[in-house]
Regions:
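ABC ATPase NBD coupling module
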Residues: 24, 78-95, 107, 119, ...
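The feature captures the beta-strand-to-loop junction immediately N-terminal to the Walker
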Residues: 46-48
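Helix-to-loop junction immediately C-terminal to a conserved catalytic motif
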Residues: 61
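Conserved ABC ATPase "signature" region
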Residues: 76-77, 114, 118, 125-143, ...
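Short coil-to-helix segment of the ABC ATPase nucleotide-binding domain corresponding to the Q-loop/switch region
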Residues: 107-115
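Conserved signature/switch motifs of ABC ATPase nucleotide-binding domains
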Residues: 146-149, 167
């Protein structure tokens, strides 16, 4: 992708949880962690289990505070040490897709997608049309009035993805969103995600354990070390877009990139 402005910067981030009464301070989960993300970049992050990947995303989403360091969004610091001052999602500037779809069981597919817009007071003819467009883009047309228990796991994941994209946040955090589905469904969800990303090229930070997934989706992959987590390596993904994720193993540059990342993860 071409050069673009830095949208999000993480500067010497550190996180340790408060000690329990009468105990020693907890070890650092994250320490001296720094990276930046460009506007419109698809950044993937891989690392061993327990490397603090979810903790990092929670801090970026302002669900949790950092112990030290700074987060800069679009040139302005959004760092806070006070849990009472947290603003989850930076006032709608950050979307967050987790492993769980968290769909409301009493709302239909369409109503789940529209929920965030309702809460934000942004539900109107234009945003409703955007919701319908995204629903069609991921193959959910005809299932708008189905309830979560009537949907397959993959369809629930697509609904959760569209629910986040519909309010058009400039940054989207994704914490292993496809980890719980079978391989075939996962490949289709990856293809759906790339299709949606290509519609608007929002900045995505995507955490995964799967090196193949990191390569198939990302412009660049960061490797986290074991705790205390830092950036152990950075790998540009030399595979041009558009990509067919079903053919990723056969694409030039995949095998060499996979081996480099695997060596750094280990």
């Amino acid at each position: 992708m071409g050069a673009s402005a830095t949208l999000l910067e993480v500067r010497e981030l550190g996180k340790r949880f408060p000690p329990r009464q009468g105990r020693e301070p907890s070890p650092w989960v994250i320490q001296d962690l720094s990276f930046s993300v460009r506007d419109g970049e698809f950044l993937t992050i891989v690392g061993p289990s327990g490397a603090g990947k979810s903790t990092l995303l929670n801090i970026l989403a302002q669900i949790d505070t950092a112990t030290e360091g700074e987060i800069v969004f679009n040139g302005a610091s959004v760092t806070t040490r006070d849990p009472r001052a947290l603003k989850p999602g930076f006032d709608r500037r950050i979307g967050y897709v987790t492993q769980d779809d968290n769909l409301l069981p009493w709302r239909s597919t369409l109503d789940n997608v529209l929920f965030a817009l309702e809460v934000q007071g942004r539900l109107n003819e234009e945003t409703r049309a955007r919701a319908q467009m995204l629903i069609r883009a991921v193959g959910l047309a005809g299932f708008e009035r189905y309830y979560p228990h009537e949907l397959s796991g993959g369809m629930r994941k697509r609904t959760a993805l569209v629910r986040t994209l519909v309010y058009d946040p400039p940054v989207i955090l994704m914490d292993e969103p496809f980890a719980a589905v079978d391989a075939q469904t996962r490949t289709q969800l990856q293809a759906d995600l790339l299709k949606l990303w290509d519609l608007g090229r929002k900045t995505i930070i995507f955490v995964t354990h799967d090196i193949t997934e990191a390569i198939a989706l990302g412009d660049r992959a960061l490797v986290l070390s074991r705790q205390p987590s830092r950036i152990a390596a950075e790998h540009p993904i030399p595979i041009p877009r558009p990509r067919n994720v079903r053919d990723i193993f056969a694409l030039e540059g995949f095998a060499a990139t996979y081996e480099k990342i695997r060596a750094d993860v280990q």
